[in-house]
Amino acid sequence: MAHQKYGAQALLTSIRFGHSTYRSQILARTDDESIKSLADLKGKRVAFVDPASTSGYLLPLKLFKDRKIKTGKTVFAMKHDNVVSMIYQKQVDAGATFYTPPAEGEIQDARRLVFAQYPDVEKKIKIVELTDEIPNEPVVFRKGIPEAMKSKLVDAFIELARRPDGKEALTKVSSITDLKKSSDAEYKAVREMLTALGKSAESLMRL
């Protein structure tokens, strides 16, 4: 949206645990036998993160819309770990959070955020369905920066991400483990999702 309105360019994409894309997951309690597929969430209580969260609301909302599934009462928990906790505590029937594939034999999705409180969360909460993938967040450059300077900045960011101190800093800030070159074309799916939902970047920024 910033590309269309202001001429901004996405020239880098974040990488986490070797993945440059991510998706959302729909979670429910493992012992809830009434929920075996997404269709079973019709009329159920569902927790989302917040109205501006891509993985915690917009991607799941698009999934429900595409499948023509109307849930029951919805709540915004404001944080991904809160969504998981609400499901664990049976405050809601299901919830939507970010999904990251397992790495080194351990889960990396939102359930890991509550391991300290609920060591058995992986057994107690199941993944009902995953959404389609979209690219991780980009590094965006404003309109008007000379091409030569943009090229140097892109290379500098990539070099930073691959230096031990740079990797450590990026990991601490946002769990970013690397960066790769990209383009605005790679974010077409995100723009199409917002259009399908009748959303705009401006409306989400006001939330």
Map each language-model feature to its residues.
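Alpha-helix boundary recognition
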Residues: 3, 42, 88, 116, ...
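Short, glycine-/small- and polar/acidic-enriched structural segments
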Residues: 1-34, 101, 131
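Residues that flank catalytic or metal-binding motifs in active/ligand-binding sites
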Residues: 22-24, 42, 135
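An extracytoplasmic/periplasmic, membrane-proximal ligand-sensing/linker region
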Residues: 145-207
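Sec/Tat-exported extracytoplasmic proteins
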Residues: 3, 30, 50, 68, ...
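Extracytoplasmic/secreted envelope proteins and their assembly/folding machinery
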Residues: 23, 38, 57, 61, ...
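Pocket-lining segment of extracytoplasmic ligand-binding domains
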Residues: 32-34, 44-148
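Immediate post-signal peptide segment of exported/extracytoplasmic ligand-binding proteins
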Residues: 34-45, 197-207
